[in-house]
Amino acid sequence: MPKASVVKIVVSDPKSGKAIQIETKEPQWLYGKKIGDTIDGSKIGLDGYELKITGGSDIAGFPMRKEVEGAVRKKIWWWVDKRMRVKKTVYGNTISDEIVQVNTVIVKYGEKPFEEIYNEFKSNKQ
């Protein structure tokens, strides 16, 4: 199975609803972390920020689920509505070398306002 060499970390601000996407080429420090764990934002250039992992997706595009333990793919029953459910493949709640995207939300803000960081990322992107 091919392994992910670059991991995209999506940082969302719950106050403004805005998000930035940061790529890290050395994601080994993330391995073993689970959905719900907090990580230090200084490792991705967000000094003073604390981020909570809320989800992600693996190299094949399967979403991570908090209920599925470990770094594995499983088929689970997914409720579509009250009367119908389907089997869906999902990835477990632990980050491994097969994860390509990690979704996070800010739980503690740093000294630099997120609005300023957001504007810097937008101007660098263009």
Curated annotation (Swiss-Prot):
The entry's keywords: Ribonucleoprotein, Ribosomal protein
Protein family: Belongs to the eukaryotic ribosomal protein eS6 family.
Swiss-Prot/TrEMBL GO biological process terms: translation
GO cellular component: ribonucleoprotein complex; ribosome
InterPro entries: Ribosomal_eS6, Ribosomal_eS6_arc, Ribosomal_eS6_CS
Lineage top rank: taxon: Archaea
Gene Ontology molecular function: any one: structural constituent of ribosome
Protein name: Small ribosomal subunit protein eS6
UniProt xrefs under NCBIfam families: PRK04290.1-3
Record Pfam families: Ribosomal_S6e
